């Protein structure tokens, strides 16, 4: 039987002897522009804007102009209308067509699918300008990130950096942008989870994520663009730079992402917009929340500390002992009552549902 006890220290100075807290800095970028429609987005909306799947991509491309800039916003279309992703849009178009309550001729569906292919061809032939710090190519937020990365990776170094963003699209676009900008000492990677659904959303397996983390630990990758999946559970002792490109929403996100910086001389950078009171208040809230949480834990009386031995296991297992069980004679495997319910539910869920004709009432 496992016996354990949850313990912490009331004196944080003792904890800092073994676990170092990163040095925190606030990096301000100038006020962002309001979202606007780029020439590419305008032409696609005017020509194919009646297609629901295209409208969804256009909405994000329009939104991306403010935090990311025109280059990233236009490349949303390149991601969403790549060969594999265009087929995903075609399937979405078919599903939306079949969901229509009013009967429409199938020729209308064929015409919509053909227009999706036309949009794909239009984007493929578009002359994308290279990313530039001049004009609206990159937003002030991206330019500030570029400034930090240029300073860190201008020469060979052992810095391991994780850049946290909120959306998978953002991680992919920034990864493409900085790969395009090029730096001999910046080796990029991406950690965005396994969810797969929206157009342009790349499918990444669990194995690929594990390999990415292994390369990051070895130093083959020294800069990761990551979503919230990387906030919890990563133990990389050499990680010494965390950049919150998109600010956290909760105290837990703040503490967990800060905990990824394990190196003795680590930095944690909060990127905020100049004059943005919400960003300033967000930082103030999480810092105050951490103080309140620490005081609460220190104020717990002794009888509320978790010892791990205050549970009567015999009473908890009493019902289980009363239930029957079956032991397979050939393998020795035992099937208990509770586990049999899980097996039965899985079996029933796998059965093919049969539809029977409704009986007429006489």
Residue ranges, per PLM feature:
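Helicase motor interdomain insertion/brace
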Residues: 1-181
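Eukaryotic basic, amphipathic alpha-helical target segments in cytosolic regions
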Residues: 6, 153-156, 182, 190, ...
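Conserved helicase ATPase core of P-loop NTP-dependent helicases/translocases
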Residues: 160-164, 170-176, 185-227
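Eukaryotic short linear interaction motifs
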Residues: 170-173, 197-200, 232-233, 250-252, ...
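Conserved RecA-like helicase motor core of SF1/SF2 enzymes
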Residues: 193-197, 222, 228-264
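Conserved segment of the helicase C-terminal RecA-like domain
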Residues: 219, 256-289
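Long, hydrophobic alpha-helical segments
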Residues: 282-322
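N-terminal segment of the canonical double-stranded RNA-binding domain
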Residues: 309-361
């Amino acid at each position: 039987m496992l016996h354990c006890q949850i313990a912490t220290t009331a004196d944080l100075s003792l904890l800092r002897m073994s676990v170092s807290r990163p040095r925190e800095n606030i990096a301000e970028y100038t006020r962002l522009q309001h979202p606007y429609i780029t020439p590419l987005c305008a032409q696609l909306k005017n020509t194919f804007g009646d297609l629901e799947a295209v409208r969804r991509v256009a909405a994000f491309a329009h939104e991306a102009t403010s935090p990311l800039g025109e280059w990233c916003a236009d490349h949303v279309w390149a991601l969403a209308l790549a060969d594999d992703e265009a087929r995903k849009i075609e399937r979405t178009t078919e599903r939306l067509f079949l969901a229509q309550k009013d009967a429409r001729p199938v020729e209308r569906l064929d015409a919509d699918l053909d227009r999706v292919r036309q949009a794909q061809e239009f984007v493929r032939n578009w002359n994308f300008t290279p990313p530039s710090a001049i004009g609206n190519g990159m937003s002030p937020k991206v330019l500030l990130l570029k400034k930090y990365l240029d300073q860190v990776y201008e020469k060979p170094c052992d810095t391991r950096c994780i850049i946290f963003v909120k959306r998978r699209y953002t991680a992919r676009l920034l990864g493409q942008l900085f790969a395009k900008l090029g730096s001999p000492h910046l080796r990029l990677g991406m950690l965005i989870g396994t969810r797969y659904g929206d157009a342009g959303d790349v499918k990444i397996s669990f194995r690929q994520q594990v390999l990415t983390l292994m390369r990051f630990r070895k130093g083959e990758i020294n800069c990761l663009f990551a979503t919230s999946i990387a906030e919890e559970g990563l133990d990389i002792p050499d990680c010494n730079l965390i950049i919150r490109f998109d600010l956290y929403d909760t105290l837990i996100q703040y503490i967990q992402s800060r905990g990824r910086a394990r190196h003795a001389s680590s930095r944690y950078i909060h990127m905020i917009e100049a004059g943005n009171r919400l960003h300033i208040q967000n930082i103030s809230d999480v810092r105050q929340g951490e103080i309140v949480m620490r005081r609460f834990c220190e104020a717990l009386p002794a009888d509320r500390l978790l010892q791990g031995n205050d549970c009567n296991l015999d009473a908890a297992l009493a019902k289980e002992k009363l239930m029957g069980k079956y032991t397979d004679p050939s393998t020795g495997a035992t099937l208990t009552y509770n586990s049999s319910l899980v097996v039965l539910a899985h079996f029933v869920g796998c059965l093919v549902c049969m539809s029977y004709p409704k009986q007429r009432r006489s």
